[in-house]
């Protein structure tokens, strides 16, 4: 989908697809694969488009919590004259991530360690404890979920994270939305044949 924003100095590239619900057995691995690919500042796509190429101030993906199928969403605001090149880079990064350049042990370990270290801060207030209880009820997680979460995070295997990426991210099923100055970007984007 293309949405015109005449005179825009940047384009916002949005890409996403439906994935498994928050109650899925591999929900932690899905979160880890998301963070390696595009969910954190040091993720592959952000490092590529922001740090290596300087085409974007920052990209980010997310897996919002949901009882049913939930979206994997990536947002990449990029400079207008690099819109098509950025789309190609995102396509390449995703294809390689589920193909011949999956998450490395170092990338996975970095996310696991960060998630474990963040645990104490997740339960500092009454509101955060209440939120954790609400999540357990909403998603059908066991009563000992909070107590066992550290062990669950640490138990994620590299192969399980890579399998979550392959089962969750299917490039041919992704929906693309680009918002920008169509006078400048429409023709080259249409040549990509995104959908």
Labelled PLM ranges:
Residues 1-42:
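His/Glu-based metal-binding/catalytic segments typifying zinc-dependent metallopeptidases
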Residues 10-21, 30, 46-99, 105-158, ...:
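M16 family metallopeptidases and their MPP-like homologs
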Residues 164-167, 190:
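Short proline/glycine-enriched turn/loop segments at secondary-structure junctions
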Residues 180-184:
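A short, acidic, flexible beta-alpha connecting loop/helix-capping segment that sits on the rim
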Residues 185-194:
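Short, aromatic/basic amphipathic alpha-helical patches
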């Amino acid at each position: 989908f293309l949405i015109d924003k005449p005179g825009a100095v940047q384009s916002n590239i949005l890409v996403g697809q439906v994935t498994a619900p928050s109650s899925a057995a591999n929900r932690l691995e899905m979160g880890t694969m998301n963070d390696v690919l595009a969910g954190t500042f040091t993720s592959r796509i952000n490092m590529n488009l922001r740090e290596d190429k300087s085409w974007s101030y920052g990209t980010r993906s997310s897996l919002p919590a949901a009882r049913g199928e939930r979206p994997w969403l990536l947002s990449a605001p990029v400079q207008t004259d690099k819109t098509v090149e950025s789309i190609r880079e995102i396509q390449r990064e995703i294809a390689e991530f589920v193909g011949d350049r999956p998450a490395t042990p170092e990338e996975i370990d970095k996310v696991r360690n960060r998630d474990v270290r963040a645990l104490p801060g997740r339960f500092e207030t009454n509101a955060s404890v209440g939120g954790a209880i609400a999540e357990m009820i909403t998603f059908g997680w066991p009563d000992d979920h909070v107590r066992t979460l550290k062990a669950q995070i640490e138990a994620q295997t590299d192969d399980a994270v890579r399998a979550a990426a392959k089962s969750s991210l299917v490039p041919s099923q992704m929906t693309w939305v680009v918002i920008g100055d169509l006078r400048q970007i429409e023709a080259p984007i249409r040549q990509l044949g995104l959908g």
